[in-house]
Structures are given as structure tokens and as C-alpha cells.
Amino acid sequence: MGCGAGGSCTPRPPIRQQPAPETRVVAVVFLGLLLDLLAFTLLLPLLPGLLESHGRAHDPLYGSWQRGVDWFAAAIGMPAEKRYNSVLFGGLIGSVFSLLQFLSAPLTGAVSDCLGRRPGMLLSLAGVATSYAAWAASKSFAAFLASRVIGGISKGNVSLCTAIVADLGSPSARSKGMAVIGVAFSLGFTLGPTLGAFLPSETVPWLALLFAISDLLFIWCFLPETLPPQKRAPSVSLGFRAAVDLLSPLALLRFSAVARGPDPPTGVRLGSLRGLGLVYFLYLFLFSGLEFTLSFLVHQRFQFSRVEQGKMFFFIGLTMATIQGAYARRIRPGREIAAVKRAILLLIPASLFVGWGHTLPILGLGLLLYSWAAAVVVPCLSSVVAGYGSPRQKGTVMGTLRSLGALARAVGPVVAASAYWLAGARVCYTVCAALFLLPFSILRTLSPAAQTLKAE
């Protein structure tokens, strides 16, 4: 595949002439995504200690950022303890990562719509490996921050995984593929934080780099091209112009890049697609806020250590993987929306149990319900959305959805952390519980067309 003047693409023979079996594609996506998520989640239990180590070393950049965080914490009335400010600091770093992912995912999707999924995936994974190499070699906070910036810009591979599954021909294969992606997330967020909590901190970045390089080589060897030349977008420049619509929150919620593209969904289906996108955004906005504050809640209320938090994440991830394997992947096409509505309703008592519970059994019950929702909502919504748009627009559709998710994750943690320390855990989690009624209510208003997986 080559691009001439003006960004037009000249199709070349695909790397693999015969279409690969759908089960093989799903298996390759699962293993590749699992390697990527293992590398990504190794950092989660290390971040507080990593920030503190840069503070103890009197790193100049860290010191200037810490003073800015101190000012912001004082401006919104947060307690003055350093650990609270560090929490906000860590949240800002996480939000920057998600913001960069939000900015880059549409461009990655547009490129893959023209050049194919395989080149886009390899390019993204090369950037991810570079970010872990920078982290492993870093001695200063500036180098660590640069590694997070590179990683955020390169994180379009997750969006491409959903686009690859969306390329599959049958609705049942797409539904199972999205469920398998959910299983990969569950296993990644189960094993990654556990490894990061128990391994020596100096070995973690090198292990992340090993996972990333292994992922790159695995995809290079085994991933077939799933978007044939005749179904690709005519030019990269058209894709980039459409990507501008993916950088505006309002345009994202309206799926403007899809509506203006070739063979867009029309009428009721376009309205349903927009409704599903709004549900996806609201859910991840609220869920990511709870997800971010959870580790600090159990540290303060139950005095969980880094190892105990690793065990908690292991419990959550194992529960998610069990639910996805035994239930979510067996949901029949056309029944996804009903499953999502039930899962969102479960988050209401889950939030109340976690926010108000002062015993481990109550916390465990809340985490069980929380894990059920986490196992069901995103895979099912992704599976439904994958049925919208023409074949050449699958990357744009799924890129839009992932951009909405990245935008939600960019603002959700900061908003939740601010509410947590302004009003306390009980108020924060109670408000979130009530707000989960919003996406549930929107789902109830969607037309029956939103519950089908028939391709346009």
C-alpha cells in the first residue's frame, strides 16, 4: 500500500492473500492485547512510590510540578498532606496519558482505514516499545514523563484491536471478539498489577519492555490483514480531515466523522449510534473516577499496603475474567443492550457498598458487583457499535468510540479525585451511584435498531 501526492492510496497486494479464519484473528488479537496490557499495568502499584522517589531525589522538574499541584490542591480546598497532593499529581499524569491517547486514536484509525490494520498496529506497537525503553533507561522525572508522553501518543493499538474485530464478517464473531478483548483486559489488569506489586521495582520497566517487544514480534509474525484493499478508504488525507471531527468532544458525541464519511448510517441508526456513544462516555467518565480513587480509599480506610492492593486488583481481575468467560461471551447477538442495562444498575449498590462500607465483607461484595459491570459493559457496547458503518468506516467508528473513552478517562479521575477530597468518599461514591442512572435512562430510550448487530 502506497500513498501518492495528495495522500491518495494505491492498493498493493495484501500481505496474506487468503482471508484468515475468524477464530485465528480473534486469538491473535487476544494474545497481542494481553501482552500489551501486562506491560501497561505493571506500573499501576508502583506509581505512588515512583513519584515519592523523585521527590526525595529533589528532581527539579518534579519539584516545580509539585509546587503547581500544591497550589491547585490549596485552591480547591484539598487537605495539605503531601500524600493527598501526590494522589492528585498521579491523577494528572494519568489524565495526560489518556488525553494524548484521545488525540492520537482518531489519527491511528484514519491511517488504518487507508493503509490497513496491520501497518497501523505495527507502527503503534513500535511506539509503545519505545516508551518502555525510555522508562527503563530513565534516571530523571523528565525522562519518565517523556516515556508516558510517547506511550500515550502510541496507544492507538487498543483502538485498532477493536477495529480488527469489527472487520470480521459475522455478528456472532464480532460479539465473541469483543468479549475476548474484555477477557484480555481482565487478565491484564489481574496479572499486571500483581506482578508489579511483588517484583523488585527496578526490574519492572525492563519486564514491560520485554512484553512490548514480544508483542511487536508476535503481531509481525501472526497478524493477518483484515481490511482488504477494496474496502479501504481512498486516501489518508480524507481520513485526516475526518479525524478533525474526532478531536472535538461535541463532534465525537455526534459521530460527525462517521456521518460525513462514505456510506454513513442514516436515520434511526445514526441516532442510535450517537446514543450509544453518549452512554459509553458517561459510563467510563463515572467508572474511571471510581477506579482511580478506589486504591486510595482502601489505603486510607483499611490501611491496604502495596501488596494488599495487588491482591485486591487480582480479585477484581479474576472475577472479571470469570464473568466474561462464563457469561459475557455467551450473550447472544441482540441481547447486549439488556445485559448492559443490568450491569449498570449493579453499579449503584456497588458504589454504595464501597463508599460506605467499613468492613472487608461489605467491601468485597461491592467489588464483586463492580467487577461484574466492568466485565460486561464495555465489551457489549463495543460489540453493538461494531455493527454500525460501512466496512471502510469500521476504523473510524471504533476510533470514535475509543476516543470518547479516552476523553472520559482524561477527565473522570481528576473530577472524582477533587470531589473525593472536597466532600469525602461517601459523598463522592453516592453521587456517582446516582449518576449511573443517566446512562441507564438513555439506553431505555434507544430504538430497537440499537440492539441489532447487522452491518450496514
Task: Describe every region a protein language model picked out.
Residues 116, 137-142, 154, 170, ...:
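Helix-breaking motifs and short loop linkers at transmembrane-helix boundaries and internal kinks
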Residues 198-210, 416-440:
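A membrane-interface helix-boundary motif in multi-pass transporters
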Residues 141, 145-186:
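Cytoplasmic helix-loop-helix junction between adjacent transmembrane helices
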